Amino acid sequence: MAAAETQSLREQPEMEDANSEKSINEENGEVSEDQSQNKHSRHKKKKHKHRSKHKKHKHSSEEDKDKKHKHKHKHKKHKRKEIIDASDKEGMSPAKRTKLDDLALLEDLEKQRALIKAELDNELMEGKVQSGMGLILQGYESGSEEEGEIHEKARNGNRSSTRSSSTKGKLELVDNKITTKKRSKSRSKERTRHRSDKKKSKGGIEIVKEKTTRSKSKERKKSKSPSKRSKSQDQARKSKSPTLRRRSQEKIGKARSPTDDKVKIEDKSKSKDRKKSPIINESRSRDRGKKSRSPVDLRGKSKDRRSRSKERKSKRSETDKEKKPIKSPSKDASSGKENRSPSRRPGRSPKRRSLSPKPRDKSRRSRSPLLNDRRSKQSKSPSRTLSPGRRAKSRSLERKRREPERRRLSSPRTRPRDDILSRRERSKDASPINRWSPTRRRSRSPIRRRSRSPLRRSRSPRRRSRSPRRRDRGRRSRSRLRRRSRSRGGRRRRSRSKVKEDKFKGSLSEGMKVEQESSSDDNLEDFDVEEEDEEALIEQRRIQRQAIVQKYKYLAEDSNMSVPSEPSSPQSSTRTRSPSPDDILERVAADVKEYERENVDTFEASVKAKHNLMTVEQNNGSSQKKLLAPDMFTESDDMFAAYFDSARLRAAGIGKDFKENPNLRDNWTDAEGYYRVNIGEVLDKRYNVYGYTGQGVFSNVVRARDNARANQEVAVKIIRNNELMQKTGLKELEFLKKLNDADPDDKFHCLRLFRHFYHKQHLCLVFEPLSMNLREVLKKYGKDVGLHIKAVRSYSQQLFLALKLLKRCNILHADIKPDNILVNESKTILKLCDFGSASHVADNDITPYLVSRFYRAPEIIIGKSYDYGIDMWSVGCTLYELYTGKILFPGKTNNHMLKLAMDLKGKMPNKMIRKGVFKDQHFDQNLNFMYIEVDKVTEREKVTVMSTINPTKDLLADLIGCQRLPEDQRKKVHQLKDLLDQILMLDPAKRISINQALQHAFIQEKI
């Protein structure tokens, strides 16, 4: 026993030096990464070589020489020492310790100081000369070997060689550290001073260089032997607080061999050693991180974890009584700079570790490729299959050493990713830990819960540094649960205000001293902020929901009040989130009736008011211009002339009395199949003809009075007498009946059919009487000026209602234009008429001449399949014409129509062009538009290929023209322009739908 004591005393200075040198190397982070793990034994030898080599630079005291001699016998003696070690540590007399301390302290510190300075000045980047700190760490690592034996075997299986060297190293370290408690204390103080100096000078370099240095240090650690690394890491974590350690050791002591007693002594000195070498922590935690970071490993270790968690639980309850914050083992896997705080004492709860959040994140990222490699090796290792006894032993040791680490990690600044992973993994295993904090988990919002997923493991650095509190929320939930109930009140308020002041208040990045504040307070502060965040979020969302509900309630009431004439469902409103189509239609119909009531006699006045808005010069200029352009609707060729006694009709002989020309009695039909109308004749024994309205493609129309119904005025449409026209007339009859049946209340502004009959082999349809069509209205009231915006808005509402009914009945009108829209006497109500071109939506034969040319949609021209969109296009052209009095697209040919449409909306989409049957008439192989125009000089057709067509027509300028509009009207014109833009989309798929049009602001908002 005495021999063992003296040997350990002699070995002590060298071991201290080895430790110090290794820690400096690791702190500088210069280790090469590409040396493989299986070379560990060679490096062990090298390490001893280094130790002896560097003794030149150190004190060569008598003890050292003696020690060198004794060193040879270490291997033989280590087994005996394991047994007597426990009594050794008790037997050490304080006098010997003091004596030893006094002997070596001064010399030691002097030389180490010089070495550290030299290292700082010269070898910071190279790391070739191993300093005193490095040597200390080296001895420290070799001393930790025995405990890590199992991990060593897991890595390479070379257990026997490892054990001999590891035990030898361990004996050195144990005795060594018993005798040098005081010296290591003073030395650690000295080193702490140095390191803070060094940190100041080194700050910039570390941040810039940290990726390189860390990877280097990793490599050297790796090459020094993975076994040592893991073992030293394992042990170094044990010793944060002596009390804690002692208690947990008592708990676990049963499962340990006598050699484990050494841990107690080592722990004391190692807690001081940790102060000396913060980067040891880095390497340790990194190694630990390897275990918990990889999902594969998590699965592999879940069994271990389950059994561990039981022991953990008992230990936790113990430490809870001491009010020490303890986290689950997985929480200790902090990485990189998180563990850098040099001046930490075991008793304190350090609040911060990182130089700054960003470098920490960088280090995480830079390490990852290597970690994956190591992880995969580890997961395959046999350590998972160790005997239960051995596994329990290593587990208990591991757990014991993790407790201080847990405390160290409880700072708000550190939240390792492994923490998240292992927590998730533990919840899968349903370990007792989950039962410690049910409320904590339940209170988590879905968003936060989601952040645990593997994908979120690698959160962005920005996020990690932005919310340090959130990062380690779950970490301290266990011990916190009881404490919270006790100290909730004032402390929570205090900590909340603290957090709000400055979220980075406690970080070492400001170079501040660590405040001595209880870690339980820390934990509370963190938890309460999170809780408050969640509650605030929930409250905020609840308020938003209420506001939305209130808003729509109010809007619904508002819309119900504003439409008193029409019953509407309680929740109905066109402004609610999703008003039903019926509600929209009700509102629009009510608007129309209101307009009708208010404007019975004001139509002409409103048109005059619009005329007055035009400037005199513009009026003159435009009228002169118009004289030059031929009007296609002049009376001479207007088939909708208002009066039957026009010169043309008289010349044709229509309107002469029968008595004057009795030969006409048998000649009812002219050469083209039209019925020869005679004023005064009676049709079907009841309709007394008194006027002639006009002649269309399919028919001519007369005005009559119904003798059977108290001379009620009607319009009688007499279809041309030929097979095709009869067929067309019957089709129109069918559609009209269908539409009328679908609209019994006459809300949808399609012409009402009263009845039909045959007269002289002509099919006759009897309609409600309407005075004029919109073409005539425009000529009479709004030539080149158009109608008032109020009238246009009302007409547009009614037209959209008519389209709605058509769509409900699956009918395409296919000839909407001002000529086919009739108005009543007061010009307030319009009706869509002339369904001679109408068809069922499924029977849409592709023909390029469907619909009157000026109102023909582009899909018809290129021969693409079409649907209700063609009627919407026609309505858009009609509305423009109603407001401006000008035709929107006065194309001379289909090709010209396409050119004019593209001048407004830009080039037609290629996708649409390709679907056109007649695309080759208007587009080349590259889908460039071929504009066919007649040369003004030669009067021959010339083709201009236009690869791009930029929209040049300004719709708004055309709509406003030279009017000086008041603000309310200007707003409506802007809305009309927006509506027309959506109606006149070249691609019918993008064109506005009828429901959308009915909800448009132009339709909904009153003037």
Curated annotation (Swiss-Prot):
> GO terms for molecular function, please?
ATP binding; protein serine kinase activity; protein serine/threonine kinase activity; RNA binding
Q: In which tissues is it expressed?
A: Ubiquitous.
Which positions carry Phosphoserine?
8, 20, 23, 32, 87, 93, 131, 142, 144, 166, 239, 241, 257, 277, 283, 292, 294, 328, 354, 356, 366, 368, 387, 427, 431, 437, 518-520, 565, 569, 578, 580, 852
Here the cross-link named Glycyl lysine isopeptide (Lys-Gly) (interchain with G-Cter in SUMO2) sits at 99, 111, 117, 170, 177, 593, 659
List of residues that carry N-acetylalanine? 2
Keyword Nucleotidyltransferase listed = no
Biased composition of type Basic residues is found at: 39-59, 67-81, 179-202, 214-230, 302-315, 342-367, 438-497
Q: Which keywords describe this protein according to UniProt?
A: Acetylation, ATP-binding, Centromere, Chromosome, Isopeptide bond, Kinase, Kinetochore, mRNA processing, mRNA splicing, Nucleotide-binding, Nucleus, Phosphoprotein, Serine/threonine-protein kinase, Spliceosome, Transferase, Ubl conjugation
One Gene Ontology cellular component annotation?
Answer: nucleus
Q: Does Lipid biosynthesis appear among the keywords? A: no
Provide the E.C. number(s) assigned to this enzyme.
Answer: 2.7.11.1
Record location of the Glycyl lysine isopeptide (Lys-Gly) (interchain with G-Cter in SUMO1) cross-link: 117
Major localization class? nucleus
Q: Spell out the catalytic residues.
A: 815 (proton acceptor)
Q: Which residues carry this modification: Phosphothreonine?
A: 385
PTM per Swiss-Prot/TrEMBL: Phosphorylated by CLK1. Autophosphorylated; phosphorylation inhibits interaction with its targets, such as PRPF6 or SMARCA4.
Q: Subunit structure of this entry?
A: Interacts with CLK1 C-terminus. Associates with the U5 snRNP and NCOR1 deacetylase complexes. Identified in the spliceosome C complex.
Name it: Serine/threonine-protein kinase PRP4 homolog
> Gene of origin?
PRP4K
